[in-house]
Amino acid sequence: MSFLGGFFGPICEIDVALNDGETRKMAEMKTEDGKVEKHYLFYDGESVSGKVNLAFKQPGKRLEHQGIRIEFVGQIELFNDKSNTHEFVNLVKELALPGELTQSRSYDFEFMQVEKPYESYIGANVRLRYFLKVTIVRRLTDLVKEYDLIVHQLATYPDVNNSIKMEVGIEDCLHIEFEYNKSKYHLKDVIVGKIYFLLVRIKIQHMELQLIKKEITGIGPSTTTETETIAKYEIMDGAPVKGESIPIRLFLAGYDPTPTMRDVNKKFSVRYFLNLVLVDEEDRRYFKQQEIILWRKAPEKLRKQRTNFHQRFESPDSQASAEQPEM
């Protein structure tokens, strides 16, 4: 199965076909402009192999070149500084020495057990992408074609997955206890919890749980944080009473979040928070944030095939405590 498209130059068309293209799974990714693209899916350590096909469009023509190569590239691009892209992986295979093409040709290539240390990602201010890049080197203008791939990082966690339990409130006015069943959730998981009202002396009109995504790019004074509310779950609409307990069930699968990503190549991070929001009758808002870890669980078939997945996230116990506005 070939990648869609190709380079429609004046002489030849460049196309890439993966050796396992007929059976390899594809994945979707939303671009920065909101469109959904579908590309072949790879995991860390998998080989990438196939053929580069050069098809002449004009028989009898010649194409002089200074060499033909294919690269496997992993790249981070900050949207506010597109001139400063960073390549964290760049593998090169030379396909042909300088010479002349007079007819269509195919070249085999293979990148063995390629390290793909990060998950593919497109956010508000940053893009992390993997792609194959074919270059026909010429004296004046090279012929170049890129083919995107998608990489998913799989993580495993120990059986210990502590619940989150906290008591928060406003002195002599409001005192609540909230509990979430875990601190780490896979992307298709269900957040289960409960809110218990210990003291209620203000009139609460509305209460909701939000899943918030924070994308942090840059370092030091140039750090930029983009905050997005991924999901909202209405806990109650109306005044609670002392002793009331309200259950929480938030299904992550319906919102398609990414995994937590920490300090990716010292360029960016993606973190997730549960934000408990209360609104009183005077429209004052009280909130409390708690960071959680989201991770990608291996498909059942893959879990049986492989016994050792790379764990890319450190324990949440080792990270700095998140900003938590006082309620």
Curated annotation (Swiss-Prot):
<comment type="similarity">
    <text>Belongs to the VPS26 family.</text>
</comment>
<keyword id="KW-0653">Protein transport</keyword>
<dbReference type="GO" id="GO:0006886">
    <property type="term" value="P:intracellular protein transport"/>
</dbReference>
<keyword id="KW-0963">Cytoplasm</keyword>
<comment type="function">
    <text>Acts as a component of the retromer cargo-selective complex (CSC). The CSC is believed to be the core functional component of retromer or respective retromer complex variants acting to prevent missorting of selected transmembrane cargo proteins into the lysosomal degradation pathway. The recruitment of the CSC to the endosomal membrane involves RAB7A and SNX3. The SNX-BAR retromer mediates retrograde transport of cargo proteins from endosomes to the trans-Golgi network (TGN) and is involved in endosome-to-plasma membrane transport for cargo protein recycling.</text>
</comment>
<feature type="modified residue" description="Phosphoserine">
    <location>
        <position position="315"/>
    </location>
</feature>
<keyword id="KW-0472">Membrane</keyword>
<dbReference type="GO" id="GO:0030904">
    <property type="term" value="C:retromer complex"/>
</dbReference>
<feature type="region of interest" description="Disordered">
    <location>
        <begin position="306"/>
        <end position="327"/>
    </location>
</feature>
<dbReference type="GO" id="GO:0032456">
    <property type="term" value="P:endocytic recycling"/>
</dbReference>
<dbReference type="GO" id="GO:0005829">
    <property type="term" value="C:cytosol"/>
</dbReference>
<comment type="subunit">
    <text>Component of the heterotrimeric retromer cargo-selective complex (CSC), also described as vacuolar protein sorting subcomplex (VPS), formed by VPS26 (VPS26A or VPS26B), VPS29 and VPS35. The CSC has a highly elongated structure with VPS26 and VPS29 binding independently at opposite distal ends of VPS35 as central platform. The CSC is believed to associate with variable sorting nexins to form functionally distinct retromer complex variants.</text>
</comment>
<dbReference type="GO" id="GO:0005769">
    <property type="term" value="C:early endosome"/>
</dbReference>
<dbReference type="InterPro" id="IPR028934">
    <property type="entry name" value="Vps26-related"/>
</dbReference>
<dbReference type="Pfam" id="PF03643">
    <property type="entry name" value="Vps26"/>
</dbReference>
<protein>
    <recommendedName>
        <fullName>Vacuolar protein sorting-associated protein 26A</fullName>
    </recommendedName>
</protein>
<dbReference type="GO" id="GO:0030906">
    <property type="term" value="C:retromer, cargo-selective complex"/>
</dbReference>
<keyword id="KW-0967">Endosome</keyword>
<dbReference type="GO" id="GO:0031982">
    <property type="term" value="C:vesicle"/>
</dbReference>
<keyword id="KW-0813">Transport</keyword>
<dbReference type="InterPro" id="IPR014752">
    <property type="entry name" value="Arrestin-like_C"/>
</dbReference>
<dbReference type="GO" id="GO:0005764">
    <property type="term" value="C:lysosome"/>
</dbReference>
<dbReference type="GO" id="GO:0097422">
    <property type="term" value="C:tubular endosome"/>
</dbReference>
<keyword id="KW-0597">Phosphoprotein</keyword>
<dbReference type="GO" id="GO:0005768">
    <property type="term" value="C:endosome"/>
</dbReference>
<feature type="compositionally biased region" description="Polar residues">
    <location>
        <begin position="316"/>
        <end position="327"/>
    </location>
</feature>
<dbReference type="GO" id="GO:0042147">
    <property type="term" value="P:retrograde transport, endosome to Golgi"/>
</dbReference>
<dbReference type="GO" id="GO:0010008">
    <property type="term" value="C:endosome membrane"/>
</dbReference>
